Amino acid sequence: MKKSLAILGGAGAIGRALTKAALSENWHVTVLDLRKTVDTYPVPEGADVKYIDLFDEQLMASTVEALGNLNGFVNAAGFTSSMKPIQNIELDEINEVIQGNLVGAFTVTKLILPKLKAKQGAIVNIASGLAQYPRPNFGPYSAAKAGLISLTKTLALEVAPDIRVNAVAPSAIDTDFIRGGAGRNKADQLDIDFKMVSEMTPLKRAATTEDIVGPIMFLLSDASQYMTGQVLWVNGGSYMP
């Protein structure tokens, strides 16, 4: 029998790569994402799609209600806005980033827990290295991802032993989502020097989506059945917690 996986933000670069990998391992995959994002970045053939918006509580509830029971849930949704020091950021910008990276994930996770408990499933949250090692001009995003890690650990305690909850925290990946969130903001908002990132990384390259997919699939699998409340830092050795 196929295992069932829902991917929040599944039309993003990490989500599409994860969908492809999960389909190749005979998972039934449902992508949850904005209609505009799915139209712009079609998901791999074989995946189901349900539309969701992390700024629409009613739509979140109805979309999750329509799902069947799940073996896995991956929260790959998220975006950052333009790079600014905190003193130059307006409150509405902060609220948008916190909602899209933390509050929305909190809401969908809360709604989806009964679907996972029925099959003793696993949750994987996609955090960020900026949660542990912040950099200037990423204040709201760093705070949101740090909150997501705290949420991961708290939830792991609360839902054990029925559901495992872990996180993957990657370094910078050259995707549309790190450049503003496909479907919500412009994809060229941020100017990140990936050549410099590569030079500063012991493995001498920036991360790819495939680098992130492997650890996610591991945390969804029975190979990690004794892991919960943990964070896998996937960063090429650029920082070592």
Where are these regions (language model features)?
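Active-site loop-to-helix junction immediately N-terminal to the catalytic Tyr of the SDR YXXXK motif
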Residues: I89, P134-S142, T154, G181
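Short C-terminal tail/terminal secondary-structure segment
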Residues: M217, T228-P241
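Substrate-binding pocket helix/loop in short-chain dehydrogenase/reductase
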Residues: K84-I86, E90-I98, V197
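Active-site helix of classical SDR
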Residues: T109, A144, T152
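Alpha-helical segment proximal to the catalytic Tyr-Lys
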Residues: P114, A156-P161, Q225
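Residue(s) in the substrate-gating loop at a strand-loop-helix junction
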Residues: S128
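Conserved NAD(P)H cofactor-binding loop of Rossmann-fold oxidoreductase domains
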Residues: A76-S82, G237
